[in-house]
Protein backbone atom coordinates (compact mmCIF):
# COMPACT_ATOMS: atom_id res chain seq x y z
CA UNK A 1 0.00 0.00 0.00
CA UNK A 2 2.76 2.46 0.96
CA UNK A 3 4.68 1.52 -2.18
CA UNK A 4 1.67 2.33 -4.36
CA UNK A 5 1.14 5.60 -2.51
CA UNK A 6 4.78 6.51 -3.12
CA UNK A 7 4.38 5.83 -6.84
CA UNK A 8 1.24 7.97 -6.92
CA UNK A 9 3.13 10.86 -5.36
CA UNK A 10 6.08 10.50 -7.73
CA UNK A 11 3.99 10.45 -10.92
CA UNK A 12 3.34 14.16 -11.29
CA UNK A 13 0.16 14.32 -13.38
CA UNK A 14 0.08 18.13 -13.26
CA UNK A 15 3.38 18.07 -15.15
CA UNK A 16 2.05 15.42 -17.54
CA UNK A 17 -1.00 17.54 -18.40
CA UNK A 18 1.19 20.59 -18.91
CA UNK A 19 3.64 18.80 -21.22
CA UNK A 20 1.50 16.37 -23.18
CA UNK A 21 -1.94 18.01 -23.03
CA UNK A 22 -0.93 21.67 -23.23
CA UNK A 23 -2.69 22.21 -19.92
CA UNK A 24 -5.99 20.74 -21.13
CA UNK A 25 -6.96 18.64 -18.14
CA UNK A 26 -6.95 18.37 -14.37
CA UNK A 27 -5.16 15.82 -12.23
CA UNK A 28 -7.61 13.23 -10.91
CA UNK A 29 -8.14 12.81 -7.18
CA UNK A 30 -10.45 9.80 -7.39
CA UNK A 31 -12.16 7.59 -9.98
CA UNK A 32 -15.00 10.13 -10.36
CA UNK A 33 -14.65 13.02 -12.82
CA UNK A 34 -16.24 16.46 -12.41
CA UNK A 35 -19.95 16.45 -13.17
CA UNK A 36 -20.59 12.93 -11.86
CA UNK A 37 -22.63 12.53 -8.68
CA UNK A 38 -20.30 12.03 -5.74
CA UNK A 39 -17.45 14.09 -7.14
CA UNK A 40 -16.22 16.61 -4.59
CA UNK A 41 -14.27 19.72 -5.45
CA UNK A 42 -11.83 21.60 -3.26
CA UNK A 43 -10.25 20.32 -0.07
CA UNK A 44 -13.07 17.84 0.56
CA UNK A 45 -12.23 15.99 -2.64
CA UNK A 46 -8.44 15.78 -2.63
CA UNK A 47 -6.51 12.55 -2.19
CA UNK A 48 -4.90 13.23 1.19
CA UNK A 49 -2.48 10.35 0.70
CA UNK A 50 -0.96 12.15 -2.31
CA UNK A 51 -1.75 15.83 -1.76
CA UNK A 52 -1.71 18.48 0.93
CA UNK A 53 -4.10 21.41 0.91
CA UNK A 54 -1.98 24.58 0.76
CA UNK A 55 -3.27 28.14 0.34
CA UNK A 56 -6.56 27.00 -1.10
CA UNK A 57 -5.07 24.56 -3.64
CA UNK A 58 -3.99 20.91 -3.69
CA UNK A 59 -0.23 20.53 -3.59
CA UNK A 60 1.46 17.21 -4.32
CA UNK A 61 3.37 15.82 -1.37
CA UNK A 62 7.15 16.18 -1.70
CA UNK A 63 9.32 13.49 -3.23
CA UNK A 64 11.13 13.09 0.09
CA UNK A 65 7.87 11.93 1.66
CA UNK A 66 7.49 9.31 -1.08
CA UNK A 67 11.04 8.12 -0.39
CA UNK A 68 10.18 7.87 3.30
CA UNK A 69 7.25 5.60 2.42
CA UNK A 70 9.62 3.39 0.45
CA UNK A 71 12.00 3.17 3.40
CA UNK A 72 9.11 2.13 5.64
CA UNK A 73 8.30 -0.84 3.39
CA UNK A 74 11.92 -1.96 3.00
CA UNK A 75 13.17 -0.10 -0.08
CA UNK A 76 15.59 2.58 1.17
CA UNK A 77 16.99 4.50 -1.80
CA UNK A 78 15.12 2.13 -4.09
CA UNK A 79 17.06 -0.92 -2.88
CA UNK A 80 15.43 -4.05 -1.50
CA UNK A 81 16.76 -4.16 2.06
CA UNK A 82 16.52 -7.97 2.06
CA UNK A 83 18.17 -8.85 -1.27
CA UNK A 84 20.19 -5.70 -1.96
CA UNK A 85 18.73 -5.53 -5.47
CA UNK A 86 17.25 -2.35 -6.96
CA UNK A 87 13.48 -2.07 -7.11
CA UNK A 88 12.56 -2.53 -10.77
CA UNK A 89 9.05 -2.15 -12.16
CA UNK A 90 7.73 -2.92 -15.65
CA UNK A 91 5.40 -0.76 -17.72
CA UNK A 92 3.61 -2.47 -20.61
CA UNK A 93 2.43 -0.24 -23.43
CA UNK A 94 1.00 -0.61 -26.92
CA UNK A 95 1.88 2.94 -27.97
CA UNK A 96 4.53 3.47 -30.64
CA UNK A 97 6.12 6.48 -32.28
CA UNK A 98 7.96 9.60 -31.11
CA UNK A 99 5.22 10.74 -28.73
CA UNK A 100 5.04 7.30 -27.14
CA UNK A 101 8.82 7.39 -26.64
CA UNK A 102 8.52 10.81 -24.99
CA UNK A 103 5.82 9.56 -22.64
CA UNK A 104 7.80 6.44 -21.75
CA UNK A 105 10.85 8.57 -20.98
CA UNK A 106 8.67 10.83 -18.84
CA UNK A 107 7.35 7.92 -16.75
CA UNK A 108 10.90 6.62 -16.34
CA UNK A 109 11.97 10.05 -15.10
CA UNK A 110 9.10 10.21 -12.60
CA UNK A 111 10.04 6.94 -10.91
CA UNK A 112 13.71 7.79 -11.00
CA UNK A 113 12.91 10.68 -8.64
CA UNK A 114 12.27 8.10 -5.91
CA UNK A 115 15.14 5.82 -7.02
CA UNK A 116 12.85 3.24 -8.63
CA UNK A 117 13.93 1.75 -11.96
CA UNK A 118 11.31 1.48 -14.70
CA UNK A 119 11.56 -0.84 -17.69
CA UNK A 120 9.16 0.02 -20.52
CA UNK A 121 8.03 -2.99 -22.54
CA UNK A 122 6.43 -2.26 -25.92
CA UNK A 123 3.94 -4.92 -26.95
CA UNK A 124 1.22 -5.47 -29.52
CA UNK A 125 -2.42 -5.06 -28.53
CA UNK A 126 -3.24 -8.79 -28.48
CA UNK A 127 -0.34 -9.62 -26.18
CA UNK A 128 -1.20 -6.64 -23.98
CA UNK A 129 -4.80 -7.85 -23.63
CA UNK A 130 -3.51 -11.34 -22.78
CA UNK A 131 -1.38 -9.88 -19.98
CA UNK A 132 -4.37 -8.04 -18.56
CA UNK A 133 -6.49 -11.20 -18.69
CA UNK A 134 -3.72 -13.26 -17.11
CA UNK A 135 -2.99 -10.65 -14.46
CA UNK A 136 0.69 -10.57 -15.45
CA UNK A 137 0.85 -6.88 -16.39
CA UNK A 138 2.53 -4.92 -13.62
CA UNK A 139 2.11 -1.29 -14.68
CA UNK A 140 0.01 -0.01 -17.58
CA UNK A 141 -1.93 3.07 -18.66
CA UNK A 142 -5.64 2.86 -19.43
CA UNK A 143 -8.48 5.36 -19.76
CA UNK A 144 -12.24 5.11 -19.47
CA UNK A 145 -15.15 6.75 -21.30
CA UNK A 146 -18.29 6.12 -19.29
CA UNK A 147 -21.33 4.42 -20.76
CA UNK A 148 -23.67 6.62 -18.72
CA UNK A 149 -23.21 9.47 -16.20
CA UNK A 150 -23.48 7.61 -12.92
CA UNK A 151 -20.83 6.88 -10.26
CA UNK A 152 -21.59 3.16 -10.58
CA UNK A 153 -20.15 3.23 -14.11
CA UNK A 154 -16.80 4.35 -12.72
CA UNK A 155 -16.66 2.48 -9.42
CA UNK A 156 -17.36 -0.88 -11.06
CA UNK A 157 -13.89 -0.67 -12.58
CA UNK A 158 -12.59 -1.49 -9.08
CA UNK A 159 -15.27 -4.01 -8.09
CA UNK A 160 -13.54 -7.23 -7.01
CA UNK A 161 -16.01 -9.70 -8.62
CA UNK A 162 -15.45 -7.95 -11.95
CA UNK A 163 -11.72 -8.65 -11.94
CA UNK A 164 -10.27 -9.04 -15.44
CA UNK A 165 -8.11 -12.02 -14.44
CA UNK A 166 -10.62 -13.79 -12.19
CA UNK A 167 -13.95 -12.93 -13.77
CA UNK A 168 -13.32 -11.49 -17.25
CA UNK A 169 -14.68 -8.12 -16.10
CA UNK A 170 -13.42 -4.56 -16.54
CA UNK A 171 -11.44 -4.45 -13.30
CA UNK A 172 -8.07 -4.62 -15.08
CA UNK A 173 -6.10 -3.92 -11.89
CA UNK A 174 -7.72 -6.99 -10.27
CA UNK A 175 -8.25 -4.89 -7.16
CA UNK A 176 -10.31 -6.53 -4.43
CA UNK A 177 -11.31 -5.04 -1.10
CA UNK A 178 -14.19 -6.68 0.81
CA UNK A 179 -15.46 -3.42 2.29
CA UNK A 180 -15.32 -1.63 -1.06
CA UNK A 181 -17.15 -4.52 -2.76
CA UNK A 182 -19.86 -4.55 -0.11
CA UNK A 183 -20.38 -0.81 -0.37
CA UNK A 184 -20.47 -1.02 -4.15
CA UNK A 185 -23.31 -3.53 -4.02
CA UNK A 186 -25.22 -1.17 -1.72
CA UNK A 187 -24.55 1.90 -3.83
CA UNK A 188 -24.94 0.64 -7.36
CA UNK A 189 -28.75 0.82 -7.65
CA UNK A 190 -29.50 3.49 -5.06
CA UNK A 191 -31.14 6.79 -5.91
CA UNK A 192 -28.93 9.84 -5.48
CA UNK A 193 -29.24 11.17 -1.97
CA UNK A 194 -27.39 11.65 1.34
CA UNK A 195 -27.04 7.92 2.04
CA UNK A 196 -25.63 7.16 -1.40
CA UNK A 197 -23.26 10.12 -1.15
CA UNK A 198 -22.00 8.91 2.23
CA UNK A 199 -21.29 5.47 0.77
CA UNK A 200 -19.49 6.97 -2.23
CA UNK A 201 -17.34 9.11 0.07
CA UNK A 202 -16.26 6.01 1.99
CA UNK A 203 -15.54 4.06 -1.22
CA UNK A 204 -13.34 6.87 -2.51
CA UNK A 205 -11.51 7.04 0.81
CA UNK A 206 -10.78 3.30 0.61
CA UNK A 207 -9.48 3.54 -2.95
CA UNK A 208 -7.32 6.56 -2.17
CA UNK A 209 -5.77 4.69 0.76
CA UNK A 210 -5.22 1.40 -1.10
CA UNK A 211 -4.03 3.19 -4.28
CA UNK A 212 -4.70 0.40 -6.80
CA UNK A 213 -4.46 3.18 -9.39
CA UNK A 214 -2.09 6.10 -9.64
CA UNK A 215 -4.89 8.46 -10.64
CA UNK A 216 -4.33 10.08 -14.01
CA UNK A 217 -6.20 13.11 -15.28
CA UNK A 218 -9.61 14.23 -16.45
CA UNK A 219 -9.32 15.71 -19.97
CA UNK A 220 -10.55 19.19 -20.78
CA UNK A 221 -11.36 20.12 -24.37
CA UNK A 222 -12.31 23.40 -25.98
CA UNK A 223 -14.80 23.95 -28.79
CA UNK A 224 -15.66 26.97 -30.92
CA UNK A 225 -19.09 27.34 -32.51
CA UNK A 226 -21.00 30.05 -34.35
CA UNK A 227 -23.91 31.75 -32.64
CA UNK A 228 -26.40 30.09 -34.99
CA UNK A 229 -25.55 26.63 -33.61
CA UNK A 230 -27.86 25.67 -30.73
CA UNK A 231 -28.16 22.71 -28.33
CA UNK A 232 -24.41 22.21 -28.48
CA UNK A 233 -22.91 20.79 -25.29
CA UNK A 234 -19.70 18.90 -26.09
CA UNK A 235 -18.67 16.16 -23.68
CA UNK A 236 -16.39 13.16 -23.65
CA UNK A 237 -19.16 10.68 -22.94
CA UNK A 238 -21.63 10.92 -25.83
CA UNK A 239 -20.79 10.46 -29.50
CA UNK A 240 -24.21 11.33 -30.90
CA UNK A 241 -24.38 15.07 -30.21
CA UNK A 242 -25.17 15.94 -33.84
CA UNK A 243 -28.70 14.54 -33.58
CA UNK A 244 -29.52 17.17 -30.94
CA UNK A 245 -27.91 20.20 -32.55
CA UNK A 246 -30.01 22.85 -34.28
CA UNK A 247 -28.98 25.41 -36.89
CA UNK A 248 -30.70 28.80 -37.22
CA UNK A 249 -30.48 29.39 -41.00
CA UNK A 250 -31.90 32.94 -40.86
CA UNK A 251 -29.30 34.07 -38.34
CA UNK A 252 -26.61 32.29 -40.32
CA UNK A 253 -27.59 34.08 -43.53
CA UNK A 254 -27.76 37.44 -41.77
CA UNK A 255 -24.33 36.99 -40.26
CA UNK A 256 -22.89 35.89 -43.60
CA UNK A 257 -24.25 39.02 -45.27
CA UNK A 258 -22.84 41.21 -42.50
CA UNK A 259 -19.43 39.57 -42.59
CA UNK A 260 -19.15 39.31 -46.38
CA UNK A 261 -20.09 42.83 -47.53
CA UNK A 262 -18.03 43.92 -50.56
CA UNK A 263 -14.92 45.85 -49.62
CA UNK A 264 -13.96 48.06 -52.55
CA UNK A 265 -10.98 49.81 -50.99
CA UNK A 266 -8.38 47.13 -51.84
CA UNK A 267 -9.76 46.81 -55.39
CA UNK A 268 -9.61 50.57 -55.95
CA UNK A 269 -6.08 50.66 -54.57
CA UNK A 270 -5.10 47.86 -56.96
CA UNK A 271 -6.59 49.73 -59.93
CA UNK A 272 -4.77 52.93 -59.01
CA UNK A 273 -1.55 51.01 -58.55
CA UNK A 274 -2.02 49.45 -61.98
CA UNK A 275 -2.71 52.81 -63.58
CA UNK A 276 0.33 54.26 -61.87
CA UNK A 277 2.47 51.50 -63.35
CA UNK A 278 0.96 51.80 -66.85
CA UNK A 279 0.94 55.62 -67.11
CA UNK A 280 4.72 56.09 -67.67
CA UNK A 281 4.71 53.44 -70.39
CA UNK A 282 1.69 55.04 -72.04
CA UNK A 283 3.33 58.52 -71.97
CA UNK A 284 6.53 57.11 -73.48
CA UNK A 285 4.53 55.38 -76.19
CA UNK A 286 2.67 58.62 -77.05
CA UNK A 287 5.97 60.47 -77.35
CA UNK A 288 7.35 57.86 -79.70
CA UNK A 289 4.18 58.01 -81.82
CA UNK A 290 4.32 61.78 -82.10
CA UNK A 291 7.96 61.64 -83.04
CA UNK A 292 7.28 58.98 -85.68
CA UNK A 293 4.41 60.99 -87.17
CA UNK A 294 6.51 64.16 -87.23
CA UNK A 295 9.36 62.39 -89.00
CA UNK A 296 6.96 60.87 -91.51
CA UNK A 297 5.41 64.27 -92.27
CA UNK A 298 8.85 65.86 -92.79
CA UNK A 299 9.72 63.10 -95.25
CA UNK A 300 6.56 63.67 -97.26
CA UNK A 301 7.30 67.43 -97.53
CA UNK A 302 10.75 66.84 -98.91
Task: Identify the role of each PLM range.
Residues 91, 110-163, 199:
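Periplasmic binding protein-like
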Residues 1, 38-63, 78-86, 131-135, ...:
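Short, solvent-exposed loop/beta-turn-alpha elements that line the ligand-binding surface or hinge
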Residues 273-287:
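Alpha-helical transmembrane segments
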Residues 13-16, 23-27, 36-39, 95-99, ...:
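Solvent-exposed loop/turn segments at secondary-structure junctions
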Residues 27-73, 95-102:
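Structural transition elements
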Residues 1, 5, 9, 14, ...:
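Solvent-exposed, polar/charged alpha-helical surfaces in well-ordered, non-transmembrane soluble domains
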Residues 290-302:
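Cytoplasmic C-terminal tails of single-pass
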Residues 17-21, 73-95, 140-143, 189-227:
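Bilobed periplasmic-binding protein-like "clamshell/Venus-flytrap" ligand-binding domains
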Amino acid sequence: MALRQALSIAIDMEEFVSIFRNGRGIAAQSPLPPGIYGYRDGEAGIDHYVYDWVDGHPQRKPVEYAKQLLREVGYPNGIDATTGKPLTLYLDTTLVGPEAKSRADWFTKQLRKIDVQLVVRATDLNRFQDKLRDGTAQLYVLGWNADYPDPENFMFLLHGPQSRARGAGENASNYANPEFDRLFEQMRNMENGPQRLQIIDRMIEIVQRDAPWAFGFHPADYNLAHGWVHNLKPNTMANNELKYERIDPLLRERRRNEWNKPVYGPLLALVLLGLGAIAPAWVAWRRRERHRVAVQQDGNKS
